Amino acid sequence: MINRLEVDEFWADSTIIEAGDYVFVGYCMGNEGQPVEDQIDGAFVTLENRLKLAGLGLDSVVKMDCMFKDINDLNYLADIIKKHFDGKYPTRKAFTTDFIREGILFQIDAIAYKG
C-alpha cells in the first residue's frame, strides 16, 4: 500500500510517502538564507519532523542523499550528523546541485525503514 502523508500541490510532489516497510522523505530544508551549518541543522530538524508523521525517528533512516550548493560545505556534515543520529548513522551520498532559490545551500532526501 502507498500512503502519501504530505503533498505539496504547488510543486506537484509528495514530500513523505509510505510504501510498504519504507518511508521516502524529500525536500528537507531549513533555515533558508542562513549560514550552511544552520541550514544543515535545520534540514535534519525538518527530516525528523516529517518522520514523526509516519511514527518514526531519525534512527529509522537507512539512506540519505545530501545535496550541497558548494561541495566544500561537506566538511560541516559529519559533526552535525553525529549531533542528530546518536551513533545510528545511515548510508549517505553527497553531491552538488543548483537550487531554485538563491538562499538554499543544503537539502536532504531520505529513506527510512518502518518494519
Language-model features, listed with the residues they occupy:
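N-terminal presequence-like segments and the immediate start of the first folded domain
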Residues: 1-62, 68-115
